[in-house]
């Protein structure tokens, strides 16, 4: 049976990668709902291609443009945070893929967990801001939370099936755009330089957070909540490759 997916943040880099996987595996997955913050044009194109049941645009000012773009379809169009909460709790959804950016991802995760949905989580701020609440809530509702961002997904896969306790977790780190800069050089770097990641093409926020290493701090916190490992047993390894 196909897994019915609500994809939050479908127009961002992780959302687009998720749709690539769905496109390549039509027998395994189907899209029921797509959401975006304000990129209504891409959202409309995606909704038509994947024959989504509904779409949500978080920025209510874009609602009219999105509704008009989908006027000739049967796709239901919603806007705002409350609509986001309602679609993730729909009985037509099996898996919620949370690819939202920032704190905006927290409340949809909570709503999905309360409905007992499986959450494929790429939004690290959910656990950075609310891990102490979200993880016990997920356990209470028997709602699996599966990390899909690179480092935590790798750790999750390594630990699956293992019965011995975890002694230590190592989170890898590319080092970002400034990994070879001295402290003195860092005083004069620009936004444009920070956005030139040496390895990956990502959204602006995650690229900046990578350059400042704030992202890696978030990932240590995320690993703590996901795997129940104390922070003192989580280390970071610079691995430019």
Predicted regions mapped to residue ranges:
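Active-site-proximal loop->helix
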Residues: 17-26, 45-46, 127-142, 158-161
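Substrate-binding/catalytic subdomain of NAD(P)-dependent oxidoreductase enzymes
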Residues: 208-241
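Rossmann-fold NAD(P)-binding glycine/threonine-rich loop
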Residues: 66, 103-115, 124-143
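N-terminal Rossmann-like dinucleotide-binding module
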Residues: 1-55
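Rossmann-fold dehydrogenase core element
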Residues: 134-152, 167-169
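Glycine-rich nucleotide/cofactor/substrate-binding loop typically near the N-terminus or early
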Residues: 32-88
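Beta-loop-alpha module in the N-terminal Rossmann-like domain of NAD(P)-dependent dehydrogenases
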Residues: 79-111
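Conserved anion/nucleotide-ligand pocket segment
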Residues: 152-215
């Amino acid at each position: 049976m196909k897994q019915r997916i609500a994809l939050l943040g479908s127009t961002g880099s992780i959302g687009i990668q998720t749709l690539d996987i769905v496109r390549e595996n039509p027998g395994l997955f189907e899209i029921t709902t797509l959401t975006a913050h304000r990129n209504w044009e891409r959202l409309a194109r995606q909704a038509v291609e994947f024959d989504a049941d509904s779409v949500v645009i978080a920025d209510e000012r874009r609602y009219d443009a999105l509704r008009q773009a989908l006027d000739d379809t049967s796709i239901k169009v919603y806007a705002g945070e409350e609509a986001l909460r309602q679609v993730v709790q729909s009985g037509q959804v099996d898996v919620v893929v949370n690819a939202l950016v920032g704190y905006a991802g927290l409340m949809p995760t909570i709503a999905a967990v309360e409905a007992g949905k499986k959450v494929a989580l790429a939004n690290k701020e959910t656990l950075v801001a609310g891990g102490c609440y979200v993880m016990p809530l997920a356990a209470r509702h028997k709602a699996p939370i599966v990390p899909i961002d690179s480092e935590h997904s790798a750790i999750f896969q390594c630990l699956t099936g293992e019965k011995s306790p975890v002694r230590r977790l190592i989170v890898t780190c590319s080092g970002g755009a400034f990994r070879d800069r001295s402290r003195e050089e860092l005083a004069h770097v620009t936004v444009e330089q920070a956005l030139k990641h040496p390895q990956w093409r990502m959204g602006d926020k995650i690229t900046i957070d990578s350059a400042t290493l704030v992202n890696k701090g978030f990932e240590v916190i995320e690993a703590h909540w996901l795997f129940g490992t104390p922070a003192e047993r989580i280390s970071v390894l610079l691995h430019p490759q």
